[in-house]
């Protein structure tokens, strides 16, 4: 039977608001694809992201551009060259993996030859606010032992220090989303070098020609600067020593698997990350948890509501998806 591609959109309200250096969000628009293939229906979700010049309309249009190939039975392998590494390809790639798992009667982790995924501690994100408010939120989030702090400028250092005082049991990820300059980064590293900081995520704009001292603590993690495996040698030479792999950036589970595997082999600390989205967007990455040193899949926790049959979150941990959700 010929496949049928169905494209839908959904808007998820944020629990409160989600503020990072470049924007404040109250609603998260996502694009979901379904591939109908006789007895099977598979799914994938992506998040159009303004930072990469994506909108719901542009992503939908790009997915539509390969409708005939999808409905004619394109393989996961051929999809990699049919679309660039981006959100559109992510949704389709994940749906094709889900379809193969259903048809083969095997979980995606088995198809990849990986260890069975297990429940993992996930980082929990605190969006930008005053130091007192962020410290209070950190105390409220006592079940989460790893906290990701969004900062928008050098004043965010005060919030970091306030949270370290309020939650001495926690380890932190500092995420500046490209908001600092080199002098400010040096100040942040000097202030935090003796504290339990896993890494500082994308402190400088991704397109700045710069290098980091890999011996300086905390180490630097690439987020906006990382998209595909081809970026890894350059990032290593620049002094990045950690990578945040997101399926919406790299173009799906196929490339996410290669990124985590190759990055780990090169010596990077690896993080399985996400855009804010539903459990359907998190589920594919949970299949790769054995390749990740750090899990940052808290997207559904930041929403007012999640998709049906979503991931289980409890006591700071996230569990792998049930087959009714994905994979």
Kindly give the residue locations of the regions a language model identified.
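Short helix/strand-capping turn motifs
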Residues: 293-296
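Catalytic core of soluble alpha/beta enzymes
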Residues: 149, 154-290, 304-316
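N-terminal capping/lid subdomain adjacent to the active-site entrance of alpha/beta enzymes
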Residues: 1-172, 179-186, 191-193, 307-327
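Active-site cofactor/co-catalyst pockets and adjacent glycine-rich loops in catalytic enzymes
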Residues: 300
